[in-house]
Design a protein with these regions (language model features):
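RNase H-like nuclease fold core
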Residues: 1-42
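Mobile genetic element proteins and their domesticated derivatives, centered on retroelements
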Residues: 7, 12, 32, 46-49, ...
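Conserved, non-catalytic sequence blocks in retroelement Pol enzymes and Pol-derived host proteins
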Residues: 19-23, 41, 47, 94-99
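Acidic/histidine-rich, metal-coordinating catalytic segments
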Residues: 43-54, 71
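Short, aromatic/basic amphipathic alpha-helical patches
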Residues: 52-62
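Short hydrophobic/aromatic-enriched beta-strand-loop microsegments
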Residues: 62-71
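RNase H-like two-metal-ion nuclease catalytic core shared by retroviral integrases
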Residues: 70-86, 95, 100
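C-terminal domain-tail junction helix/linker
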Residues: 90, 101-144
């Protein structure tokens, strides 16, 4: 059994994905340290579910004053899990935690490229953003 840890910003972009075999303080610390190192600044808020592993990890990093926990507060992260869960069911599970980590990291980058917040843009803006995303995608595929 593996657990999916996902960090999502306020706009719904996936910041990072981590696949771990445990849901404990050490795993929570690993994700938080990875994010703090990658982005080099503390977040405005850290919203999590009621898992008790987050509070000690935030305390160890000195960001416990930013930590908000509770039911329904982390809906953005939970909703970003849904496509992954559907895809995982279709693929009959991943063969290993490593293959899940590689796939999900690549998928997050592609998702962020094509994730246009449609309800906040006009049709014209949406078409322009979508065309830019497709151009980027074609460049990446051609380089590979």
């Amino acid at each position: 059994m593996v657990y999916l840890w996902r960090a999502v910003d306020a706009e719904g972009e996936v910041l990072d994905v981590l696949v771990q075999s445990k849901r404990n303080k050490h795993a929570a610390l690993k994700l938080m340290r990875k994010l703090l190192k990658k982005y080099a600044f503390a977040p405005e808020r850290l919203v999590t579910d009621d898992l008790r592993s987050y509070a000690p990890a935030a305390r160890d990093l000195g960001i416990e004053h930013l930590h908000e926990r509770g039911r329904w507060r982390n809906n953005r992260a939970e909703n970003s899990h849904q496509p992954t869960r559907r895809r995982e069911r279709k693929m009959q599970r991943f063969k290993s935690a490593g293959s899940a980590q590689r796939f999900l990291s690549a998928h997050a980058a592609v998702y962020n490229t094509f994730n246009v917040r449609r309800h906040l843009t006009s049709a014209q803006s949406h078409r322009v953003l979508r065309a830019a995303a497709m151009t980027t995608w074609r460049e990446v595929v051609a380089a590979a």
